[in-house]
A protein has these predicted regions:
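Short, structured coil/loop segments at alpha-helix boundaries
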Residues: 12, 83-86, 96, 103-104, ...
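Residue-identity detector for threonine
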Residues: 32, 37, 77, 124, ...
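A short structural micro-motif
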Residues: 69-70, 178-182, 277
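Weak global preference for isoleucine
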Residues: 67, 114-116, 202, 243, ...
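Phenylalanine-focused residue identity feature
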Residues: 47, 61, 73, 86, ...
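Membrane-embedded catalytic scaffold of the fatty acid hydroxylase/desaturase
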Residues: 1-147
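Cytosolic-facing loops and C-terminal tails of multi-pass membrane proteins
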Residues: 131-215, 222-242
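Substrate-recognition/cap regions that form aromatic- and gly/pro-loop-enriched pockets
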Residues: 204-285
Length: 286
């Protein structure tokens, strides 16, 4: 089930819109594994219905899903080379580097989460070539530190093309066809340049030393806040969680905006303070 969910996440535009968040990073390290979609569960559950119909107990499903998720953390690294026989049977760092690459030779390969046998069985396996360095990211470059835009980018593009398509069938196909497919009339009115590896430049807007230190401290504070939020989320009321989630989101958005030079550090602190004050007032804190 996971193999087909993952594969369709690359072959169906609406599923790719959710999964793209995980692939947007132009670096490939353990932090990439933590870059997870916020909307994948909206349609992803459909692929696990056969397991429910087959009578798989929820506890077994949950444990296996957790093992699958935790296993995939360590394969997001460039520090581990090829592992010989292990690469032939399992999802490994080498195999998963191929999966994250945008090179023509590597595109849409190696979907297996733990076993790579599924890719060998269904014809989607590709070995990492020592002469073809993996280039990471997405072909529709994000070029932003905005967490909201990161989650909405692909959806926005699909909505635009669907809205402007003249034929109703094309309005639907925009969402179901493979990523990159566009109705002829939309492509003519809103042309996009063809993909080129030359455009895969690392997004690295200039930052002063002060901004770099500001970002480091802010990230540490936000990371602590996220940890505290997750620690109590299961027992806290929904309204409580929603309010603190909004505070953290404002903080993350403001930090990204500072790093891109869209707002200054003082403005970011003012926005974060306003969000925090509003939250504490709404929750009745004094």
């Amino acid at each position: 089930c996971y193999y087909w969910l993952h594969r369709m996440g690359h072959e169906s535009a609406v599923l790719w819109a959710a999964h793209a968040v995980h692939h947007q990073s132009q670096d490939y390290n353990l932090s990439t594994a933590l870059r997870q979609t916020s909307s994948g569960a909206l349609l992803g559950w459909v692929f696990y219905v056969p397991m429910a119909l087959a009578g798989v107990p929820p506890l077994v499903f949950g444990v296996v899903a957790l093992i699958d998720l935790l296993y995939q953390f360590w394969v997001h690294t460039e520090q581990v080379g090829k592992l010989g026989w292990f690469d032939r049977w399992f999802c490994s760092p080498s195999n998963h580097r191929v999966h994250h690459a945008v090179n023509d030779a590597y595109l849409d390969k190696n979907y297996g989460g733990i076993l790579i046998l599924w890719d060998r069985l269904f014809g989607t396996f590709k070995d990492e070539d020592d002469h073809e360095k993996c280039v990471y990211g997405t072909r529709g470059l994000l070029n932003s530190w905005d967490p909201l835009w990161a989650n909405a980018q692909v959806y926005a593009g699909l909505a635009h093309d669907s809205w402007h398509a003249r034929h109703w069938a094309d309005k639907l196909k925009v969402w179901t066809k493979p990523p990159g497919w566009r109705p002829a009339d939309v492509a003519e009115r809103f042309p996009k340049p063809a993909f080129s590896m030359a455009q895969m430049q690392i997004f690295q807007p200039p930052m002063s030393r002060a901004v770099q230190w500001f970002a480091l401290v802010q990230f540490a504070v936000l990371l602590t806040g996220v940890g505290a939020f997750l620690w109590q989320a299961d027992t806290a009321p929904l309204a409580h969680n929603a309010i603190w989630f909004a505070v953290l989101l404002v903080g993350q958005w403001a930090l990204g905006a500072v790093m891109q030079g869209r707002i200054g550090m003082l403005m970011a602190l003012m926005l974060q303070s306003a969000a925090l004050a509003t939250a504490t007032s709404a929750l009745g804190f004094t």
